[in-house]
């Protein structure tokens, strides 16, 4: 069911999103700040909006209406808590009068500065309101705003990693990447190498060394690492902004389609057969003996016996 939902989402986005250049951006933050968002999970709800508003603000100054979709991620390859945002933005948008399509570019350095300031301000303002829970690792050192700033100020002086991928001529690459990236579980079954009832061993890619490494932990630690990434019920992992927001897309997307000479198509229906053909190269309704088409005849339900 999860695979079908993922492919259905990808198919829908590929048909709805405008055919234009896209820029994929990954917003990260220093590891020293991750625990603040683990201890204050309600703040995760604001991160996508902060990331999107940075680009919306830049575009607004140029009188251009852009489209954005984002995805929140909380885990690294080794299942540790690692908060970051994946964002795709159109490299063009509607002019102020909504009559023409204008090109726009974003600068990595200024984007990083605005993201860094916004996150630091978020933590400071939340603390001033008395709503910030201090992570366990900082409880012995943070007792007032001044001591909090002793933690935040050095991080503000650092260069934060905001990655700009190579621009894509179409949204398909970003949609396929984000769809499978967000909809999949934190750890693919293929990466699990060993389990003996007490110990779990899995493989992961170390981004620093660029090599695959093995991670060994107890069963309890593995479960703890895994369940920390379960989002709150109804939490929106993927969000839309600008002309892709649900508030504006109904009015603006038809205009954009006309300007880009694009004819939107009805998303392809994802079925059990299409998934089997795509990933298993097998038609489930073809007889393995004679090659004839199988015909559905009846469905039998398992009987429940009373005890």
Regions found by a protein language model. Name each.
Residues 1-307:
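Beta->alpha loop/short-helix hinge microenvironment recognizer with preference
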